[in-house]
């Protein structure tokens, strides 16, 4: 292996620990986001039965400050979804990186006939990508449902402003 190849290999191996840590953090965050989402879904369901605004963040924000424009409410919605949107996009990338980094040592172990080392490297690689994809799937789903909720809330605010009351 040339010195340039060794340098590239060495640098890539330095990223394994931080990337695995990032995948674990994103995985944990995804379940935090799922819990917050389920709580909001419960609040919205209960609010529908009771006729309150609980769980309807944009409607609550508008009720507190009726001078908020549609653009400001939309910015609030985007801010509320931002972290989960980032996780849904970054987690698969980090999962791919976490898969590729151990592949080099796994292939080297295969070439050297060290099947136990190869197995360990592949276990790390595939475990990381699985966790990353689960994190991405959870956050993707929560973002898309919230996007619909916020669109409904914005529509309700617009109807309220124009006096058009629809069910």
Language model region names:
Residues 74-78:
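Helix-boundary and loop/linker segments of multi-pass membrane transporters
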Residues 1-59, 79-150:
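Hydrophobic alpha-helical transmembrane segments of small proteolipidic membrane proteins, enriched
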Residues 47-62, 153-167:
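Membrane-cytosol interface motif
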């Amino acid at each position: 292996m040339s010195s340039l190849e060794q340098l590239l290999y060495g640098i890539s191996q330095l990223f394994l620990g931080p990337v695995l840590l990032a995948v674990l953090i994103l995985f944990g965050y995804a379940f935090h986001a799922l819990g917050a989402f389920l709580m909001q879904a419960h609040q919205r369901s209960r609010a529908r039965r009771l006729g309150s605004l609980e769980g309807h963040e944009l409607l609550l924000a508008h009720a507190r400050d009726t001078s908020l424009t549609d653009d400001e409410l939309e910015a609030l919605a985007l801010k509320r979804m931002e972290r989960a949107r980032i996780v849904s996009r970054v987690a698969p990338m980090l999962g791919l990186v976490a898969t590729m980094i151990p592949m080099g040592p796994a292939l080297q172990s295969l070439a050297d006939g060290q099947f136990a080392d190869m197995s360990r490297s592949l276990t790390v690689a595939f475990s990381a990508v699985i966790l990353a994809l689960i994190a991405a799937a959870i956050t993707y789903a929560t973002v898309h449902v919230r996007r619909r909720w916020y669109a409904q809330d914005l529509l309700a605010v617009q109807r309220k402003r124009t006096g058009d009351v629809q069910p």
